[in-house]
Amino acid sequence: MNDKSTVKPPMWFWIVCVIALLWNLIGVSAYLSEAFMTEDVFATLPEAQQSLYETRPKWVTAAFAIAVWSGLMGSLALLLKKKWAKAIFVLSLFGILLQQLYHCFLSNTFEVMGTTAMILSILIIIFGAALVLFANFASNRNWLS
């Protein structure tokens, strides 16, 4: 068998791929805005939010980085119709789950950030899992090579 997929994916496959790419670009943007936050911007945050950032363990930041960068790579792999997109999305989901474990059970993130942060955390987990399932579905349909 050659490196080409045997079945042409439907138009909605490409729409999902673009949505996945945009979603993950938002995640990368959020990560970069945190990673490169200036002291002046940090000083404008409420004290409780500053404390969240200052006390967050390095492994949580690493999980965040893994989640967003592998999510972006998985989205690009889908657009290139590569089977390894699924493995990259699994890595992204692992990063998501580690990060959300901390936010949900090991910190007071939701007390400080409110209900919106809780809803966003749930959506991130759902979207991460959906991308793993979608990549698996696309692979099973021979849309990926």
Describe each PLM feature range.
Residues 1-145:
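Topology signature of small-to-medium multi-pass alpha-helical membrane proteins
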